[in-house]
Regions:
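Short glycine/proline-enriched turns and hinge-like loops at secondary-structure junctions
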Residues: 64-65, 133-135, 159-164, 178-181, ...
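Structural signature of FAD isoalloxazine-binding scaffolds in flavoprotein oxidoreductases
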Residues: 63-73, 133-137, 215-217
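A short, Trp-centered hydrophobic/proline-enriched beta-strand micro-motif
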Residues: 117-125
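Alpha-helical interface subdomain recognition
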Residues: 1-79, 83-89, 101-106, 113-117, ...
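Short Gly/Pro-enriched turn/cap motifs at secondary-structure boundaries
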Residues: 114, 129-132, 156-159, 175-176, ...
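Flexible, small-/acidic-enriched active-site or ligand-binding loops
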Residues: 136, 190-218
């Protein structure tokens, strides 16, 4: 068993870390305060190959593996969680599903612009009445000649305001309740209309929006087979959760870095905070849990990269990493004391950003269901 990263993985990690420290971290606080989407960052990431890390080179990507991709997500999220999730949705939830389930023509048409960062991707599954119960969606796609007429509304769609390509799910068979009648479609920005942006607790450098769709699309916009959209969605989430787990690790690592530096500098009771046993214990626990979460993430990413079933491992990584990030960002605030509760230091932002990792791409409660059903043999793990 080799715990060392490959030279290529280390190189990609270093590129992402250097860019994040130079181009993202110095501005993250400003983006958060101003609720600004830093559109200028994504073409720069694309120039480095970081918008299509694990996309084959012949389709415009860097040709690296999924482990390299989660390493990139951790580094980006360490600097700014909003940038991290934008890249995560773009890659895990849009580009890779098209790569996995699309025809040769669909891959050639849609993947290169995504991998080159010419357009951003958005994943449109959630609806007002279909959150964790994704099989209850009401958006419909009805046959219209040789195409489809898609009509409905979506809720909480990350990056919708800025996306050019949407992976959208609609019901093609209204006689089939639950997930059986759901299909997946690849749409362009012209097919949807963003109606409002959410005001959120965190992730203020990205947008989360409601949208409506009322458009006719050609038949070649159907991804995979009719009625197989729920399978596409679940396989997408199985991989996407690994990316969100990496995001959570990045946020927690940033909080630890800040708390450690503060403890080494701040003096109380005649000594540095770092010399107080209570603070040492907090930092030790933070480091321990971050390392444990990172190992779970890398195991899940390795299994996906090698084509092994990874639903259970991805759920474990996301569950542990997200809850760990919420705990440890709170501990970072505690180490800072009153200063941690102010906007003067970034730890309050890390705390706000961490919370969502327990909710999107499957809540902690859903992750526990996925894990339980897997260990009890009640769920077949898709490979994709």
């Amino acid at each position: 068993m080799d715990f060392e990263l490959t030279p290529e993985q280390r190189e990609i990690q270093a590129v992402a870390r250097e860019f994040a420290r130079a181009e993202i971290e110095p501005h993250a606080g400003e983006w958060d305060r101003e609720h600004r989407f830093p559109a200028e960052i994504y073409p720069k990431l694309a120039e480095l190959g970081l918008m299509g890390v694990c996309v084959p080179e012949e389709l415009g990507g860097a040709g690296a593996d999924f482990v390299s991709y989660v390493l990139v997500l951790e580094e980006l999220s360490r600097a700014d969680a909003g940038v991290g999730v934008t890249v995560a949705v773009h890659t895990s939830a849009v580009t890779l599903p098209i790569l996995a389930f699309g025809t040769d023509e669909q891959r050639a048409r849609f993947v290169p612009p995504l991998a080159r960062g010419e357009v951003l991707g958005a994943f449109a599954l959630t609806e007002a009445e279909a959150g964790s119960d994704a099989g209850s969606l009401r958006t419909t796609a009805t046959p219209d000649g040789d195409g489809w007429h898609i009509a409905g509304a979506k809720r909480f769609i990350s990056t919708a305001r800025h996306a050019g390509t949407f992976l959208l799910f609609a019901r093609t068979d209204t006689s089939e309740p639950g997930p059986a009648g759901v299909s997946a479609f690849v749409l362009d920005a012209e097919h949807v209309r963003v109606t409002r942006d959410e005001e959120k607790l965190g992730l203020n450098s990205t947008t989360t929006s409601d949208l409506v769709v009322d458009a006719r699309v050609d038949g070649d916009r159907l991804l995979h087979e009719e009625g197989e959209g729920f399978h596409v969605a679940m396989a997408t989430l199985d991989g996407g959760r690994i990316g969100i787990a990496a995001q959570a690790v990045g946020i927690a690592q940033a909080a630890f870095d800040a708390a450690r530096a503060y403890a080494l500098e701040r003096r109380q009771f005649g000594s540095r905070l770092a010399e107080l046993q209570a603070i040492q214990h907090k930092l030790a626990d933070m480091s321990l849990e971050i390392d444990a979460a990172r190992l779970l993430v890398l195991r899940a990413a390795w299994r996906k990269a090698t084509g092994l079933p990874h639903a259970e491992e991805g759920a474990k990584a996301k569950l542990f990493a997200s809850e760990m990030a919420r705990r440890q960002t709170a501990e970072a605030i505690q180490i800072f004391g009153g200063y941690g509760y102010t906007k003067e230091f970034p730890v309050e932002r890390y705390y706000r950003d961490a919370k969502i990792t327990e909710i999107y791409e499957g809540t902690s409660e859903i992750q526990r269901l996925v894990i339980a059903r897997s260990i009890l043999g009640l769920r077949k793990q898709p490979v994709g």
